[in-house]
Amino acid sequence: MDKEVTKIESDDTSSVEIKVLLFARARELTGVPDLTLKMPSGSTTQKCLDELVLKFPSLEEVRSCVVLALNEEYTTDSAIVQHRDELAIIPPISGG
């Protein structure tokens, strides 16, 4: 069974490609567990999140409260992404 990969591309000749993992409510809002995102070189994790919200406006619901992880380590929104990095979008998880 082939897995469909969602790609979001930005028009720029000098770019990096990263894998974005979506968890919990972010996954529900987008309908995808992961995707490939092409961004200009030097982009921050915040710029990546901005691009995701443009593609999936419903993510605005969780944008202000997500935690970002870059290559399995929590990070800030000013971290620079590199080619083949993995960016996780982790909304708060509630339950009982």
UniProtKB/Swiss-Prot annotation:
Post-translational modifications = C-terminal thiocarboxylation occurs in 2 steps, it is first acyl-adenylated (-COAMP) via the hesA/moeB/thiF part of MOCS3, then thiocarboxylated (-COSH) via the rhodanese domain of MOCS3.
Q: Which residues cross the membrane?
A: none
Q: Which UniProt keywords apply?
A: Cytoplasm, Molybdenum cofactor biosynthesis, Nucleotide-binding, Phosphoprotein
State the superkingdom.
Eukaryota
**Chain positions with Glycyl adenylate modification:** 96
Instruction: Name positions with the PTM 1-thioglycine.
Output: 96
Where in or outside the cell it occurs: the entry states:
Cytoplasm
InterPro entries noted in UniProt: Beta-grasp_dom_sf, MOCS2A, MOCS2A_euk, Mopterin_synth/thiamin_S_b, ThiS/MoaD-like
In this record, what's one Pfam family? ThiS
Tell me the pathway: Cofactor biosynthesis; molybdopterin biosynthesis
One BP term from GO? auxin-activated signaling pathway
Subunit-structure text: Heterotetramer; composed of 2 small (MOCS2A) and 2 large (MOCS2B) subunits.
Question: Can you tell me which family this protein belongs to?
Answer: Belongs to the MoaD family. MOCS2A subfamily.
What's the protein name?
Answer: Molybdopterin synthase sulfur carrier subunit
